[in-house]
């Protein structure tokens, strides 16, 4: 017998930015009953699941999945003080669905993680890292991705996916809000999964900006796997520095600046 998961109603509402009143209007289920279903006071029946699925045009199977809910605070995307809560919830809900889908596929295919190296090089320091330390970790990361120590990274997405990191576009970017979300990438450094996910938000950005965004999230996955106690500002600063050091290693930067100095 199929069991329906009340947490999926909450997840759907976060993604679709739907209030209980709006769901009542579309399904005919009272707000009181929806609240009781969500809080597991009354059973979530197939009849109710079918009404909700029809209302939001979701497959019925969506409401029987059992992914562990992800608190928005565990994700690494940035937001301004004026970003609306419903936009934050939509981004985190979409990421949760993506990560859950990737996890199920990995389990069915019996895929094993090839990312032990992240655990090996992830820092445990309780204080912000020096630029020298971040440069060193960025260089180690390039080697684990089978990249040269210097020179451009031709395809960031391919380099990440080759080692077992899924890179996926997202759509919950807050375009309908007066205060758009300030983030362009999302990840969850502490999530225990064989295939971690980097999500990037669908804006009309240049290729260089997208490359930076993806490596920025890779930086979070490595630098903050064991250091989530840092402030958000500290984590963002470190991930920025990591992305810069990964995409333009120190030796490349020195060579470029030395050449420019000689020309002038």
Where is each model-derived feature located?
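Short juxta-domain linker segments that transition from a proline/glycine-rich
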Residues: 1-264
